[in-house]
Amino acid sequence: MSQQPGSARRVNFPEEPMTLGEKFSHRMDQLKEIIADGGCSRAAKCVSITVCLVLLVLIFGGAIVYLVMSLTSSAQKMSADSMDISPQAIRHPKFWPPTDKIRFDDLNGIPMTSLFPQNVSTCSGFGFACTGAVHMVIPSSKRCDGRRDCEDGSDEENCKECQSVFSCKLRPEEESKKKGRSTVQPTLICLTAQHLCDNVENCPDGSDEAVCKSSCSKDQFKCPGSNACLPLSAKCDGINDCADASDEKNCSKCQNNAHKCGKQCIKASHVCDGVAQCADGSDEQQCDCQRCSGTDKALCDDGTCIMRTQVCDGKKDCTDGMDEEDCPGSCTIESFSPKLKMVTCSDGKQYTEAEACSGSFESCDHDCPNSKCHPKLAFTCPASKEARKMCISRRKVCDGTPDCDDGADEINCTPIKECGIAKNTQFKCDHKCLDSSRRCDGVWDCEDKSDEKGCDKCPSGTIKCAADKKCLPAFTRCNGVADCSDGSDELKCSCQECLGVHSNTYMCNESNRCLKRDEVCSPYSMCPNATYTDKAFCAALFLKKSGTSPF
């Protein structure tokens, strides 16, 4: 069938449904034909610019409406889920976050300072805030010292006074014009000795290269192999201005606020910086907020400056352990409970005396006070000339590997071939032979703990798992690990059971649950009915470990 010119139509088969644009175009074609039939034939022959513009406006407007609706929906969902932290970015945090300005907008605005012990200060308001990242604060001792500590170098800008060995004017021509007419201090460029006489002009007037002389004045000295004349005040200031460090040798006293440590001078920027340079830690004592300032520092009330990662890390760094008091996950032990005895083991961390003498922590093998190893849980290795008595786990006894210096843990072991299984006096496990009395006694003698399984009854002073017929050592109660299949050994924990026995545990704020401190956040709080404090603690650690916090 022939078609008349001008009456051609677009054919859309059922399997090709028209889009919104096609439908609109089709309707406009129909409109043009109606107009053409009415006498305006030219309208049917030309493409209406107005129609195209209207179509574009409608499409663009529809896209904007869709985008706005999507963003609004996402925002509402984010608001509704604002208390949740994505479980996909799982971390295993072990250290305290290094800042007091982490934003807790989703946690009712709990500030970092509220999670710090009462006798530890973050010294906010002191130090220098980097211009490009105001959350980054450096101590005043690092301001204008010739070294860039801020990423944008702002700590070395607009300097009116330098703490470096050399300085020059930023704009000597302008300063000379102002001479005698202005009391404004000139802006300085601060340089270290390494930038002097290096054939690179760092100063506009080249004065950093003009200090190269064959001889120096009486109030100056010269480093071996260098022509730079340095002021005598640069000696014994804790800064190696000479390549061979000869300017810091044989110091009877220190200059420029450096700290004397034996015959060594600790430079001012390393005094009260949270890291002990002296063996006695004296460079981190008697500090104040002016010196112990910075994003990653904390000041104890006794004047000790520490890193913020040391706060609430289980190790006492300040007098009387004030940096470990009232931390999130702590609780008040009943007043009638005896004072908990703590032991510092070889890893530098604090453990309860019971833990240190149980043989369960290898870092404490040599640190049990008076070598009084637990009579049931541990095996006591005899003392030797090189070492005192050791407390090792009973699981290491007769395992084929000597752990005691004299091999006492591998003596008098019944060979596996001679194990009297038939007489029911002995049993095998982990390729060793044990007396039957070792079964179901609440002490793990086998590496796989099979000697404490399938028990109908357990002796007093141990824990019985009714669900799976296991006997557990008493110290496993409320240690943050569910050893019973039904978790009954971790239910209804008291403060004494949680913190009075274990060292690395976290008491949930408002529930009788005790968790391992380094496992309480995964990354959200694992505490049942977690409080804002529990959530804030985990949020801070998550942001620190994931690197998403701008602080």
Curated annotation (Swiss-Prot):
Cell location: Cell membrane; Endosome membrane
Transmembrane feature ranges: 49-69
Assigned keywords, A-Z: Cell membrane, Developmental protein, Disulfide bond, Endosome, Fertilization, Glycoprotein, Membrane, Receptor, Repeat, Signal-anchor, Transmembrane, Transmembrane helix
Disruption phenotype: Temperature sensitive phenotype with severe sterility at the restrictive temperature of 25 degrees Celsius. Zygotes exit the spermatheca with a pinched morphology and leave a trailing section behind and are polyspermic. The eggshell chitin layer is fragmented and often accumulates at one end of the embryo. Ovulation is severely reduced resulting in oocyte accumulation in the gonad and a disappearance of sperm in the spermatheca. Conversely, although sperm and oocyte appear to make contact in the spermatheca no visible fertilization occurs and endomitotic oocytes accumulate with age.
Ranges per topology, Extracellular: 70-551
Residue ranges of every copy of the LDL-receptor class A domain listed in the record: 122-160, 161-213, 215-252, 253-288, 291-328, 372-414, 418-456, 457-494
Glycosylation: residue positions: N119, N250, N509, N529
Gene Ontology CC terms, in alphabetical order: endosome membrane; plasma membrane
Topology, Cytoplasmic side: 1-48
Bridged cysteine pairs (disulfide): C130-C150, C144-C159, C162-C190, C168-C203, C197-C212, C216-C229, C223-C242, C236-C251, C254-C265, C261-C278, C272-C287, C292-C305, C300-C318, C312-C327, C373-C391, C381-C404, C398-C413, C419-C433, C429-C446, C440-C455, C458-C471, C465-C484, C478-C493
GO process terms (BP): eggshell formation; positive regulation of protein localization to cell cortex; positive regulation of protein localization to plasma membrane; single fertilization
Tissues showing expression: Specifically expressed in developing oocytes of adult germ line.
Chain segments annotated as coiled-coil in the UniProt record: none
Pfam families (UniProt xref): Ldl_recept_a
Membrane-protein topology: Single-pass type II membrane protein
UniProt GO molecular function: signaling receptor activity
CDD domains: LDLa
Name of the protein this chain belongs to: LDL receptor repeat-containing protein egg-1
